[in-house]
């Protein structure tokens, strides 16, 4: 088990499974028995999302400069409380604004011993080197077991797009099926007009990051050199927001 640290950066690879790692790491921080027993009150509060001193930030609840200031006040007020462990968890810190990451740096540097920062990223190359130098790092590799069953072909597709945590969400919210519909339309040369139109209706609502994932997977699955070249060019121009109709036409054309 990883030793708890003042600031931990979790680097997620495709096919990795964050939740069980987080459960183990968080319980090891707060456990009354000092061993992550998962039976004491603190451990159970973590596992049931009821631990009051866990501050969680994600894309829906993004971390901002004012959050850093608020947490600093809380941590300073409770810095002498040895038994109370304050934890702040920020997902995908590579997406933070420059103001937010600078505020986070100060929080990491000034936080008392009873506070723990946990950060996740899917692309550590986008993170400031000054931040990377102040955190311990752990890389989550592809999980050997997943908590659901899909066909072998679907598993190949889904692990190309998502971490295991995202896979669970993708299956539950239907986004995996939307990816499959578009993939079938793009990879099958005999796709009918109705199927292509249905795929287009889904594709036009995709974000650029989803489109990039889709193009990358099609590049990996096609053996047509000309098709690969066209798709590589699509990836290059994607940051400039080309018309989605043009991108889709390149995906389905042979």
From Swiss-Prot:
SUPFAM superfamilies: P-loop containing nucleoside triphosphate hydrolases
Organism of derivation: Mycoplasma genitalium (strain ATCC 33530 / DSM 19775 / NCTC 10195 / G37) (Mycoplasmoides genitalium)
Domain of life: Bacteria
Database matches in InterPro entries: P-loop_NTPase (IPR027417)
Example GO biological process: DNA-templated DNA replication
Name used for this protein in its record: Uncharacterized protein MG007
């Amino acid at each position: 088990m990883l030793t708890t640290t003042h600031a931990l950066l979790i680097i997620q690879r495709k096919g990795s499974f964050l939740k069980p790692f987080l459960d183990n790491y968080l319980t090891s921080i707060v456990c009354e028995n000092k061993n992550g027993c998962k039976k004491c009150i603190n451990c159970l509060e973590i596992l049931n999302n009821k631990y009051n001193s866990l501050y969680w930030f994600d894309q829906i609840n993004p971390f901002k400069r004012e959050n850093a200031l608020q947490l600093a006040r809380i941590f300073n007020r409770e810095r002498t409380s040895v038994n109370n462990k304050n934890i702040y968890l920020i997902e995908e810190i590579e997406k933070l604004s420059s103001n937010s990451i600078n505020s986070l740096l100060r929080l990491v540097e000034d936080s008392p011993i009873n506070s723990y920062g946990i950060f996740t990223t899917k692309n550590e190359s986008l993170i400031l080197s000054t931040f990377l130098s102040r955190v311990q790092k752990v890389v989550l590799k592809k999980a050997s077991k997943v908590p659901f069953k899909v066909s072998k072909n679907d598993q190949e597709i889904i692990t190309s797009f998502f971490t295991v945590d995202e896979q669970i969400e993708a299956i539950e919210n239907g986004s995996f099926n939307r990816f499959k519909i578009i993939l079938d339309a793009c990879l099958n040369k005999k796709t009918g007009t109705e199927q292509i139109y249905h795929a287009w209706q889904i594709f036009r609502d995709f974000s650029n990051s989803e489109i990039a994932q889709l193009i990358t997977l099609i590049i990996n699955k096609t053996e047509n050199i000309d098709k690969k070249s066209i798709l590589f060019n699509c990836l290059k121009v994607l940051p400039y927001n080309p018309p989605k109709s043009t991108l889709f036409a390149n995906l389905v054309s042979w």
